[in-house]
Amino acid sequence: MKYTKFEKARIIGARALQIAMGAPVIIDIPKNVIDPVDIATIEFENNVIPITIKRVSKVLN
């Protein structure tokens, strides 16, 4: 799925907060990566973040 830059920022930010609060990391990351935002970005790039985006279509009358 193609995400807008706003959706991408929201997904990475939400996942980074989860990681910072102690949520388990889903994929193996390099030992030198400790920043939650960097970890969330790696997860996003590998399409493993467990967050779903629900888009609502606008219906014009």
From Swiss-Prot:
Which cellular compartments is it found in? Cytoplasm
Provide the E.C. number(s) assigned to this enzyme: 2.7.7.6
Alphabetically sorted, this entry's keywords are: Cytoplasm, DNA-directed RNA polymerase, Nucleotidyltransferase, Transcription, Transferase
GO process annotations (BP): transcription by RNA polymerase I; transcription by RNA polymerase II; tRNA transcription by RNA polymerase III
- Enzyme kind, highest EC tier: transferase
The signal sequence is: none
Which InterPro entries does the UniProt record give?
DNA-dir_RNA_polK_14-18kDa_CS (IPR020708), Pol_omega/Rpo6/RPB6 (IPR006110), RPB6/omega-like_sf (IPR036161), Rpo6/Rpb6 (IPR006111)
Q: Which reaction does it catalyse?
A: RNA(n) + a ribonucleoside 5'-triphosphate = RNA(n+1) + diphosphate
Query: Where is this protein chiefly located?
Result: cytoplasm
**MF annotations from Gene Ontology:** DNA binding; DNA-directed RNA polymerase activity
Q: Which GO terms describe its cellular component?
A: cytoplasm; DNA-directed RNA polymerase complex
Q: Which family does it belong to?
A: Belongs to the archaeal Rpo6/eukaryotic RPB6 RNA polymerase subunit family.
Q: What does this protein do?
A: DNA-dependent RNA polymerase (RNAP) catalyzes the transcription of DNA into RNA using the four ribonucleoside triphosphates as substrates.
Assembly with partners or alone: Part of the RNA polymerase complex.
Q: What's the name of the protein?
A: DNA-directed RNA polymerase subunit Rpo6
Query: What would be the name of the gene that encodes this protein?
Result: rpo6
